Amino acid sequence: MNTMNIIDLHCDTLIKLHEQGCGLEDVQGHIDLDALRSGGALVQCFAVYTPTHEQVHKHKITTGPWEYFNTAADIFDREMEKHKELIRPVRCAADIRENMDAGRISALLTLEDGVCIDGKME
């Protein structure tokens, strides 16, 4: 029987980890490690959603958009290090193949909406 490798291009788990003060092993309401394993995930893209200034209090954010992006990236790095036997960050196709061969899930950090770059591409 062939199995399908799932590549999920978006989840809002990082903001939930920030709001809940938890880790990938116990986050409520979004992607967690058990769901990734049982769902046959090959790659999970973790979006950094940066709320607009009007929405920050709803998400327990007390810093500006750029600072929050860095906080979310730090959360991503922390979780990747904590669970490196199960999931590792990737930057290219070779990284995905390496993780797949080792039986690990690949994680890709992505940016949603770009509020944090404040219209500047430099």
What are these regions (language model features)?
Residues 1-122:
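N-terminal hydrophobic targeting/anchoring segments and the immediately downstream early-domain regions
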